[in-house]
């Protein structure tokens, strides 16, 4: 059973050509058959089936179906789903069960979505390959020997492998967009504050944003329209009006549109296959009437350094709560309270998380605060100013999502700096808080997916999705 889009599925559900129960059973069976792919950490077998039956009864009773009636979804395992385990793919949250729903989850449930389970990720969303997971890596659906990207690798692999129609992820510096590019799906990181972070386990609080992964732009737009908007439980959520994103997408015209192409996004070190695929898509946009404008963003070289200083500083504070005293993993090898704290954290956190906690603690220390943290905050301001200046001249900014195609499992685990460079093109939009998405741009000569990234002005998600839809359509013709 395959559906090209949620709208196609919805039409068949509402006409009663098929039932929610049938659809959910089909997805659960595929998940069971693909268990060895390690995409799901927790599968909601009984809960999803019960939910599907309730929705079928609702339709039979003549009640109004929700906007996402019967949509089969996966949730990254750093989002709270009430009464379900919440692991963040970490040993330190062993045995923890969420006691409430994240706001995004609650809003989706109110519109009749169905959650199939919680998917794998890099531990506490720290990573670019999904290898930093206490539950093991996830293979790329296009090549089992390669990574799906991260940290939302399970979300991307679930959608690409047809183990969910849409998945929620989180994006701190590229964690939705980079795996979307690696897995040939759409990955949207909205404007910071567009979606409530209530119920999302924090990594870098001033960067984190819940994102959406889907096969097509229409599905992403429908989900965004449901979960976007102000939330009293999250003071950083925006009051900006939530538009009809499908309508905004429909009003997008490529004729005369100015698309900024930064020279910094096409360095000599860029993988040739990535460069070719992205250039081809940009030329198609030109052929459709858009104007490609060369722009310069010279501060881009400082993006990775500023990002890792700021996010690790926030992470060192956010992760201090995981100490073994109140919930999760507690070491049995300690003679006093201090020893219990130290051993629980040493044994419970993985290597990459400990590396970032130590880095964050270092840059916040008295002797280095001004040298590193304060300077990185100043660089962040410069980034915002430069991108605002660029977006005053062009409608969107375009370039590759990642500098290289999916790499082999284990290839970069011993080289953290090389791993960090996977996000070199996605980090700037996160630093500035701007909306950005990755859309499939084709494949390299080895048949590996390539993503094209679009960056827009604040709250321009509809425009980005509209352009991305045209890019997808051009490849289908």
UniProtKB/Swiss-Prot annotation:
Catalytic residue positions: 76 (charge relay system), 151 (charge relay system), 175 (acyl-ester intermediate)
Pfam families in the record: Amidase
Protein family (similarity comment): Belongs to the amidase family. GatA subfamily.
Protein name: Glutamyl-tRNA(Gln) amidotransferase subunit A
GO terms of biological process kind: translation
Keywords tagged on the record: ATP-binding, Ligase, Nucleotide-binding, Protein biosynthesis
Catalytic activity: L-glutamyl-tRNA(Gln) + L-glutamine + ATP + H2O = L-glutaminyl-tRNA(Gln) + L-glutamate + ADP + phosphate + H(+)
Gene Ontology CC: glutamyl-tRNA(Gln) amidotransferase complex
InterPro entries: Amidase (IPR000120), Amidase_CS (IPR020556), Amidase_dom (IPR023631), AS_sf (IPR036928), GatA (IPR004412)
UniProt-listed Enzyme Commission number(s): 6.3.5.7
Gene3D superfamilies: Amidase signature (AS) domain
GO MF annotation list: ATP binding; glutaminyl-tRNA synthase (glutamine-hydrolyzing) activity
PROSITE patterns: AMIDASES
Gene expressing this chain: gatA
Broad EC category: ligase
Organism: Chlorobium phaeobacteroides (strain BS1)
Keyword Cytoplasm: no
Role according to the record: Allows the formation of correctly charged Gln-tRNA(Gln) through the transamidation of misacylated Glu-tRNA(Gln) in organisms which lack glutaminyl-tRNA synthetase. The reaction takes place in the presence of glutamine and ATP through an activated gamma-phospho-Glu-tRNA(Gln).
Subunit structure: Heterotrimer of A, B and C subunits.
């Amino acid at each position: 059973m395959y559906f090209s889009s949620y709208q196609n599925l919805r039409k068949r559900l509402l006409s009663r050509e098929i039932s929610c129960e049938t659809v959910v059973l089909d997805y659960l069976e595929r998940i069971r058959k693909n268990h060895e792919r390690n995409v799901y950490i927790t599968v909601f077998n009984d809960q999803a089936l019960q939910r599907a039956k309730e929705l079928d009864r609702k339709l039979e009773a003549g009640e109004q179906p929700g906007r996402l009636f019967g949509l089969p979804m996966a949730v990254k395992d750093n989002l709270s789903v009430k009464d379900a385990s919440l692991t963040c793919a970490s040993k330190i949250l062993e045995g923890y069960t969420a006691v409430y729903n994240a706001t995004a989850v609650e809003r989706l449930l109110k519109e009749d979505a169905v959650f199939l389970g919680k998917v794998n990720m890099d531990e506490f969303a720290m990573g670019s390959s999904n290898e930093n997971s206490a539950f093991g890596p996830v293979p790329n659906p296009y090549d089992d020997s390669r990574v799906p990207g991260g940290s939302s690798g399970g979300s991307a692999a679930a959608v690409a492998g047809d183990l969910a129609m849409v998945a929620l992820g989180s994006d701190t510096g590229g964690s939705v967009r980079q795996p979307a590019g690696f897995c040939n799906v759409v990955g949207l990181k909205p404007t910071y504050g567009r979606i409530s972070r209530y119920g999302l386990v924090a990594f870098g609080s001033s960067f984190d944003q819940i994102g959406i992964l889907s096969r097509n732009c229409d599905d992403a737009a429908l989900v965004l329209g449901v979960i976007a908007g102000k939330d009293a439980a999250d003071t950083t959520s925006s009051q900006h009006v939530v538009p009809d994103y499908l309508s905004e997408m429909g009003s997008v015209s490529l004729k005369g549109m100015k698309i900024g192409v930064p020279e910094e996004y096409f360095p000599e070190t860029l993988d040739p296959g990535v460069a070719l695929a992205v250039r081809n898509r940009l030329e198609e946009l030109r052929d459709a009437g858009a104007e490609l404008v060369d722009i310069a963003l010279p501060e881009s070289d400082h993006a990775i350094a500023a990002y890792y200083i700021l996010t690790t500083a926030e992470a060192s504070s956010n992760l201090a709560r995981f100490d073994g005293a109140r919930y999760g993993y507690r070491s049995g090898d300690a003679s006093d309270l201090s020893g219990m704290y130290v051993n629980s954290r040493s044994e419970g956190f993985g290597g990459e998380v400990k590396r970032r906690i130590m880095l964050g603690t270092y840059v916040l220390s008295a002797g280095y605060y001004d040298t590193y943290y304060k300077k990185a905050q100043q660089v962040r301001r410069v980034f915002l100013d430069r991108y605002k200046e660029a977006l005053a001249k062009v409608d969107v900014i375009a370039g590759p999502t990642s500098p290289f195609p999916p790499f082999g499992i284990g290839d970069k685990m011993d080289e953290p700096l090389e791993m960090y460079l996977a996000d070199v093109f996605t980090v700037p939009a996160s630093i500035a808080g701007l909306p950005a998405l990755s859309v499939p741009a084709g494949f390299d000569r080895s048949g590996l997916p390539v993503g094209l990234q679009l960056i827009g002005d604040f709250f321009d998600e509809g425009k980005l999705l509209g352009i991305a839809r045209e890019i997808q359509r051009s490849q289908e013709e």
